[in-house]
Each structure stands twice: as structure tokens, then as C-alpha cells.
Amino acid sequence: MSSVRTAVRRMKPYVPGKPVEDVQRELGLHDLVKLNQNENPLGPSPRAVAAARAAMAQVHTYPEGTARRLRERLAQMWNLPADWFLIGNGSDEVFRLLAEVYLEPGDRVVVPEPSFAAYRFVAELMGAEVVAVPLAGWTMDLPAMAEAAARGAKLLFLCRPNNPTGTVFAEADLRAALERVPPSTLVVVDEAYREFDETPFDSRALVQDYPNVVIARTFSKIYGMAGFRLGYGVMRPEVLAPLYTARDPFSVNGLAVAAGLAALDDVEHVERTRALTREGKAYLYAAFQRLGLGYVPSEANFVLFDAGRPAAEVFDALLRRGVLVRPCGSFGLPDHLRVTVGTPEQNRRFVEALKAALGEG
């Protein structure tokens, strides 16, 4: 039997949450409020669902390898050439391809901490050295990250809004940091939650002004298409072209592309989701204040809050009451939990369950 690569042996596998059906069966629950994975409670656009159904008639054929129609649609939306766009099986594939193509064993990769685990995962998979830079006041410490990158980093990952904090940094601060980052360092800005963010930030100008900047986005969040696995990267063609060498030509299925095209055209669905999220966050903030709990104001569709006690205990107490959230011990925040903004009824049930859970202590 062949031996496993050293880098893989050292890694801890990512453990996804249990399927809702399994949790319901184990706990005898019939109605579980799922607020643990930052999904859109409104679901996908009805137009996206209809487009996917129509595309079912062609599932016997292979999809077009580069998702040309979706790239062209995104090019119109961004006002950039189509060859600046790479369509992936979720934005995770974009991260993985960047690591596979640009990293050698021992290369340095700078990541924020706490943040999305995929950055560390793809770096460690390639045997890279991960340099984690702690947040400062719940947001990215851009000067410290630029300083770390200046010491020979191949990749620098940023997340805006950050997961799990929901915080953002100013465009001017990022530009100042980019001036200190070597041109040989690829700076990947993960914008999975960008469509929820109401602060000014010109991603298009950044990728135009800095040849080493990559923007990553997903259809999983505001577009409600997590199950389709669809995302994209925006970058200079000279950065993008080598990724096709390592990319599976059929990693993105035709149903996802059809749904993505329709989702981009349903502006009303996006606006309804934004309004629901805005109102839901205000409701949750007020509830946390009444309960005397600290929380981090968020530009995403979730809120990080301090339970004032071990998060695992609160998680279990909420789960017994039919509410599933995300304990943040894996992020290095043992007393914090992250809750997705749901529908008004889901938010109400969460708050009622949280009151009862805190009353147990």
C-alpha cells in the first residue's frame, strides 16, 4: 500500500455538521430551527429553481468546461473581461486551485485568526507553513498581516466580512497594506458575504489596480444556493490561466450554472434577503442587549455573541430546545457562538430558547 503524504498525515480532517435529519432522529425532534451554517432562510430564487429544472433536460450531456455563459454574465456585472473570471465548485475550489498551483512545500501562507478554516486547510494540504495573525478588536490586523506577508509569503488570505466575526476593514486600509505586500504575494480576498455588507468597498477597482489581488465570491449565501456548490474568482488572466491546468474541466455542473445565471437576474430576491437580514440583526442585537450578552456588530448574515459561559453547554441546551447554532470553540472562542439571521419566527424561537438555556446555569 502506498504511503500517505506527510502533509496529509499531519492534517485534521474537516468534520461537517451532522445532517438535520440525523440530529432530529437522535434527539426526537420534529421541528429543528437550523441557524448554524449561514444559509439564506428564504432559500434560492424561484427563478434559479425553475432554471435548474429546465436544465435537467440536458443532464445527459457534459457541461461546457469553463461555464462560459456565467463568466460572460459576471463580466457584464463587474464591467471586466470574461477571462478575468474562474467559475468553481464553490469558492472553496478557487482557494484550493490557488494553493495547488502556486504553493510548494514549505512556502509561507498568511491567514487571519479566527477566520474561515478553508484557508489553513488548503495551505496545509500543500505542505505550506501557515502563519496565523490574530485579529485586532475583532477585525483584520492589516498592518501585521502585511508585515507577515513581506517576509516571503506566497499567499495572503483575507475575509471581508470575516467569518465568524462579521467585521470588515476599510478599502483605504487595505490599499495601504497592499503597498507593503510584495507583488509576488497573491492576496486573496474572500467576499462570501459581500452582498450583505452595506459599507463602501470597490472590489473591482482593487483587482484592477493590484495585479496580485484575487477576489472570491460564492452563490451559497445571499443567493441561497449552497447545495449547488457554485462560486467564482476574479483575477488577472495571467494569474488565472495556470489554474486551468489543475482544474477538473467538469467540476461545475450545468444545473448550477443555469441556476446561477437566473439568480443574478433576480434582484428582488437579493433585496428581500438583505432587508430580512437587516431587520433580523436589529432584533438579535436588541435581544442580546436585554440578556446582557456581548456581541459583535456584523456586516454579514450572522452574529457572533458571547454566552458568558462555555459555548458547548449553551449549544447543547439550545439543541435540546430545537435550535441549532454554531459553537465557536473550533475558532478559538470557547465562550462564543455564531447564529445565522433567520426568518422572524426562527429568530424569535432562537431568542426564547437562548433565554431558557441561560436560565439553566
Curated annotation (Swiss-Prot):
Protein keywords: Amino-acid biosynthesis, Aminotransferase, Histidine biosynthesis, Pyridoxal phosphate, Transferase
Molecular-function annotations in GO: histidinol-phosphate transaminase activity; pyridoxal phosphate binding
Listed Pfam families: Aminotran_1_2 (PF00155)
UniProt-listed Enzyme Commission number(s): 2.6.1.9
Keyword Signal belongs to the record: no
GO BP, one annotated term: L-histidine biosynthetic process
Catalytic activity: L-histidinol phosphate + 2-oxoglutarate = 3-(imidazol-4-yl)-2-oxopropyl phosphate + L-glutamate
Residue numbers of N6-(pyridoxal phosphate)lysine PTMs: K221
Keyword Transport: no
Cofactor(s) the protein needs: pyridoxal 5'-phosphate
SUPFAM superfamilies per record: PLP-dependent transferases
Pathway(s) it belongs to: Amino-acid biosynthesis; L-histidine biosynthesis; L-histidine from 5-phospho-alpha-D-ribose 1-diphosphate: step 7/9
Broad EC category: transferase
Transmembrane intervals: none
Family per record: Belongs to the class-II pyridoxal-phosphate-dependent aminotransferase family. Histidinol-phosphate aminotransferase subfamily.
HAMAP family with a match to the protein in the record: HisC_aminotrans_2
Oligomeric form and interacting partners: Homodimer.
Name of the protein described by the UniProt record: Histidinol-phosphate aminotransferase
Organism: Symbiobacterium thermophilum (strain DSM 24528 / JCM 14929 / IAM 14863 / T)
Lineage: Bacteria, Bacillati, Bacillota, Clostridia, Eubacteriales
